[in-house]
């Protein structure tokens, strides 16, 4: 009798723990963030294809898409383009692009996007016409409010000198932000010196004309939009009725996947204090943007890692980044077939690398673990909604 009672107590404890775990998982807000980096978007493209493939296997659903699993998907520059590709609906109200379509997109269109050089020394390197053309063909008239999940795509308005963040949750207060996804994607990719700034107009709630004069989102978020995406997730948790149980969101309730486009390991070794002591404006101008972006990306990752670790939730945050790019793979606009093949290899090899020196788990293993959390959470919410 005592033995039977003990077994029943043990079973109850296991069920209670499991129920609590799934309840906590069901209340989590999931965030995907994708860095900028031009043609180097092939690297996160490889990672996203692997992740979506794992989700399809786990849920036995070949039609499963990343937008089904993430509450917020944010990106800047090429990351903004990927965000639009996996969240913009087709005629069946499903993402018009699967993750496996990303790399072929770069191979098909990259050489044309980065080939229309204006030939002007005092102007942008590329005219941007092909980029705008392909965005209009792929995204059509689709606007922000139609995105299949919350998005966070950044740009910078050079007329108002302020960042512009395109999200669904901002539309009630700022309906002028309900722009075409094609305009948004060009704007977030319009890196100064590479592409011309983008002008377009929408309407306010009063019907007045609202003008945008936008450049690359990296000017606003410096290439890594992870913190921006988290802030949008926080706002959604506070305002969306679907998340009423987690109004006071903290990082313990966040599941964050941040994808980089690679950094140059040799860059830190390129210059010394002695070498740069007599540099003037021209020399610094050639390298300061790369320095600033690298430093900002590092600090964003450092801040997020520290916060999640302090909350004993380090498994809730995964930064996937290649820190050893060399040669042509460091260039954002080298869309030669040879270089794109190298970038594919970088992405595939990255999956086999350890997450860090202190964590022998490979990125592939970490992404499988992440996929399991995403899958379990989706199932929990689906079961809860059926009652």
Curated annotation (Swiss-Prot):
Residues 32-230 form the PNPLA domain. A motif (GXSXG) lies at residues 75-79. A motif (DGA/G) lies at residues 216-218. Keywords: Glycoprotein, Hydrolase, Lipid degradation, Lipid metabolism, Plant defense, Signal, Storage protein, Vacuole. The nitrogen atoms of the two glycine residues in the GGXR motif define the oxyanion hole, and stabilize the oxyanion that forms during the nucleophilic attack by the catalytic serine during substrate cleavage. PROSITE patterns: PNPLA. One of its GO terms (molecular function) is phospholipase activity. Its EC number is 3.1.1.-. Probable lipolytic acyl hydrolase (LAH), an activity which is thought to be involved in the response of tubers to pathogens. It holds the Pfam family Patatin. Tuber. InterPro entries: Acyl_Trfase/lysoPLipase (IPR016035), PNPLA_dom (IPR002641). GO terms for cellular component: vacuole. Its main location: other. The gene is pat1-k1. Belongs to the patatin family. A motif (GXGXXG) lies at residues 36-41. One of its GO terms (biological process) is defense response. Transmembrane segments: none annotated. Glycans are attached at residues 115, 203. This is Patatin-05. The active site is at residues 77, 216. Residues 1-23 form the signal peptide. The keyword Kinase does not apply. Patatin have a dual role as a somatic storage protein and as an enzyme involved in host resistance. It is found in: Vacuole.
């Amino acid at each position: 009798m005592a033995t039977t009672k003990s077994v029943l107590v043990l079973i109850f404890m296991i069920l209670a723990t499991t129920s609590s775990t799934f309840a906590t998982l069901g209340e989590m807000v999931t965030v995907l963030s994708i860095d900028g980096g031009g043609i180097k978007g092939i690297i996160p493209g490889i990672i996203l294809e692997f992740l979506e493939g794992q989700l399809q296997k786990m849920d036995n659903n070949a039609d499963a898409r990343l937008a089904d699993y993430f509450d917020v998907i944010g990106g800047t520059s090429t990351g903004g383009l990927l965000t639009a590709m996996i969240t913009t609906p087709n005629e069946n109200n499903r993402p018009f692009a699967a993750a496996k379509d990303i790399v072929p997109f770069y191979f098909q269109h990259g050489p044309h996007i980065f080939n229309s050089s204006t030939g002007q020394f005092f102007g942008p390197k590329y005219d941007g016409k092909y980029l705008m053309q392909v965005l209009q063909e792929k995204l059509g008239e689709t606007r922000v409010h139609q995105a299949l999940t919350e998005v966070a795509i950044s740009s910078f308005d050079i007329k108002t000198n302020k960042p512009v963040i395109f999200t669904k949750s901002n539309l009630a207060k700022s309906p002028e932000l309900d722009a075409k996804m094609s305009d948004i994607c060009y704007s977030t990719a319009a890196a100064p010196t590479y592409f011309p700034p983008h002008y377009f107009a929408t309407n306010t709630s009063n019907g007045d004309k609202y003008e945008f004069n936008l450049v690359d989102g990296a000017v606003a978020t410096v290439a890594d939009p992870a913190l921006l995406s988290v802030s949008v997730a926080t706002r959604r948790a506070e305002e969306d009725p679907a998340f009423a149980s987690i109004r006071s969101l903290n990082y313990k309730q966040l599941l964050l996947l941040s994808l980089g486009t690679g950094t140059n390991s040799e860059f830190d070794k390129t210059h010394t204090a002695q070498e740069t002591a007599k540099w003037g404006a021209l020399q610094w101008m050639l390298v300061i943007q790369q320095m600033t972006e690298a430093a900002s990306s590092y600090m964003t990752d450092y801040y997020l890692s520290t916060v999640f670790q302090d909350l004993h939730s380090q498994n809730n945050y995964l930064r996937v980044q290649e820190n050893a790019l060399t040669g042509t793979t460091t260039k954002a606009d080298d869309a030669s077939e040879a270089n794109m093949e190298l970038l594919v290899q970088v992405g595939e090899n990255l999956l086999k690398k350890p997450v860090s020196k202190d964590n022998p788990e490979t990125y592939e293993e970490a992404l499988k673990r992440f996929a399991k959390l995403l899958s379990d959470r989706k199932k929990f919410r689906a079961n809860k909604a059926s009652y």
